[in-house]
Amino acid sequence: MSNNYTSLSSSLDEEMGLKAGHEIDLEGSPPSEHNSEEKSTLPSNSDILTSANPVSQASETPDHSIESNTGSTQSPTSHSLLLKFSFCIVYYFYFAIVVLGCVLPFEHTHTFLIAFLVIFGIISVILFSGSIYYYETWTKTVKHFLKKVISPFKKEYIVCAFLKTFVFYGLLKTIEHFLVLLSGDKWGWKCSTLSSILTPVSCISFCLNESVQLRSCSTHLFINTVAWIKSLGGGKNAFENNYNQLNETSPEDLV
């Protein structure tokens, strides 16, 4: 009996199998080389950890700049407190010397010369300490003061400063008048000297206070008084109308 067995795979299938095997062999060898190259180019585990947690290493390293900044901020505060304390002591001591100079009569020339030298020395110390005290803040003070003068909406601060100076000068002149009436003319030049010294100092102090420390108690009182006057006049428009009418009227009509 003859064997009539025939394979189910045709010649076309064999050719396809050869082609498939050839492609597999060609694709098999390059991936190993490619994978080896990729393994060499991949970052190590330590690099991955450092890139994933940069904050932990930064927190471990001490920051010397922060320590230096904290140290620099602590020293100027104590220095400024010392300057303020010394400035206040010198200022009040100078005020006491001026008052004693007005009270004590100077009959001898040597006493007057000694008192003049003492007062001159105290004034020099005050100017020196004041220049040191305002060394860091005088630019800000001048800038704020110029803004208050130039700005048309904030001139009430400067008005309040000059009103304070005027009231202070009037108080000094009243005291001078009563002292002259009680004790004679010998108090005249002393009190006038005191008022001439304290008036510019008070004017500068009030202006600086109103320009740096905005809206003090007296400024609030002034603004509230103006607002109350406007409310009594029926609002802002009525107040402006009354003000314009007063400006248009002549002095003869007012009499």
Curated annotation (Swiss-Prot):
Transmembrane parts of this sequence: 85-105, 112-132, 162-182
Q: Which residues form the signal peptide?
A: none
Q: Where is this region: Disordered?
A: 19-78
The family database entries (InterPro entries) matched by this protein are listed as: WTF (IPR004982)
Which Pfam families does the entry mention? WTF
- What is the recorded membrane topology of this protein? Multi-pass membrane protein
Q: Where is the composition biased (Polar residues)?
A: 41-60, 67-78
**Listed GO biological process terms:** meiotic drive
Any one GO CC term of the record = membrane
Compartments annotated for it: namely: Spore membrane
What keywords tag this UniProt record?
Membrane, Transmembrane, Transmembrane helix
Reading the lineage from the top rank, the first entry is: Eukaryota
Q: What is the role of the protein in this entry?
A: May act in meiotic drive.
**What family does the database annotate?**
Belongs to the WTF family.
State the name under which the record lists this protein.
Answer: Wtf element wtf15
Which species is listed as the source?
A: Schizosaccharomyces kambucha
